């Protein structure tokens, strides 16, 4: 459940009309994608849920999983703060500990600066959430 929330969170406010956006692990294996309407699918094209324009994230059964605020604050289904994604791509947990970064080219790095994956066509502020909060 936690991984699903994070996968959905990473795509908030980032779906662009006309194409889907993908995220891959360090071995370039497809982890999933988000469609232009906000629908999130895994690598097997199974629908995981949807991200809505207001920041609400729901699973495939329409259950609220969490949200992401416009300032980058990530919240769980009980509205508890999980962490943040800053405009420069830095990801921090709820205790303000730096977890890693995602660069403007989509490269995701952990706190030791090791590459952990990529996020193609995905807003860096939200893509980092998947890799650092492991909700998918």
Please tell me what each predicted stretch does.
Residues 2-48, 53-55, 63-64, 70-136:
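Long terminal segments
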